[in-house]
Amino acid sequence: MVGIIHLKLVSMGIGTDHRCLSNHLEKDAPREVQRVIAPNTLSSDVNADPIKNNKFLGYSRGAHVPSKALALRAERVAPRSSWVLYHPIWTVLRSAGPIHKHAMTWVRQLDHEIQGIVLGPYSTIVGGASRHTLGALERRASLDSLAALTLLARLHHEAGEHEWVWLYICSIFRVLLLLGTHFDQYGVAERMFQLYVQRVFSLAEFEGRRVDLSNYDYVFASYHLVGIAERVRNKHGSQRDRRMPTFYALQALTGLYEQRFKKHFQIPLVSLAES
C-alpha cells in the first residue's frame, strides 16, 4: 500500500509541476512545452516526419519522472516551475515511519512566514495546538501551511497526544477545503483529498469515533465554500479589500457564519464500534 501511495504522490507532484510549467509558458499541449524546454529532443525521421516522443505527454499525466537536468532546465526557463515536484509535503505524506528526527529539516524547507508560525522563540517546533497557531496556518492556506499542519499532526500522533491530533485534523480539513478549487484547476483535487483520507485523516479518533470521508464530495464542497465566501464578501462592502483572501471563507468555517453552514463543512464521524 505504501508503495502504491508513494507512486501516487510522485505522479501527482509531476503532473502538477507540468501544469504549472505549461501555465507559465501559456502552452497547453505537452509537445509545445517540450518545444520550449527541450527542443533538442524533437527530431525527424528519414521522411522528415516528426518522431513521436511521448515523454512529455507522460510528464503531463504524472507517468514519468523527469531527470534532474530537465527539471533544472525548466527552472531556468520558468522560475519555480519545479517547486511542486520537490515540495516537502510529498515527503511528509509518504514517510511511513516516525518523522520526529526529520521534522526540523522539513520545516526549514517551508516558506519563511510558515516557519515563523511553526517554530518557537528558541527555534523549536511548537507544542500543543493553540488556536493562534492553527488560525495563522489556516489564514495562510497554501501547500506550505498544509505541509506544516500535516507534519504537526503526525508529530502529535507519534507522541500519543490524540486530542491535539484531532484539532490538527480539523485544521487540515479546513485548509484542504480552502485549497480545493486550486487543486481542481490542476486536476489533482480528488487524488489529493483521497491521499489525506488514507494517510492523515485515518490517524484521528474523537470520543470513540473516527473520521469517515468515504462519501464526502470534496470538490463540490470546495466550490460551495467559494460561493459562500463571495456572498459574505459582498456583505462587507468597503472592507473587503483589506482582508486576507481566506478571511471570508473562514467566516463560514470557524467564524461568524460557522453555525449556519456547519452541516456542509463538518467532518463526518462514525462510531469505532461500526468500523
Locate each region found by the language model:
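Charge-dense, extended regions
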Residues: 213-275
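Helix-turn-helix/homeodomain-like alpha-helical modules used for DNA recognition
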Residues: 92-177
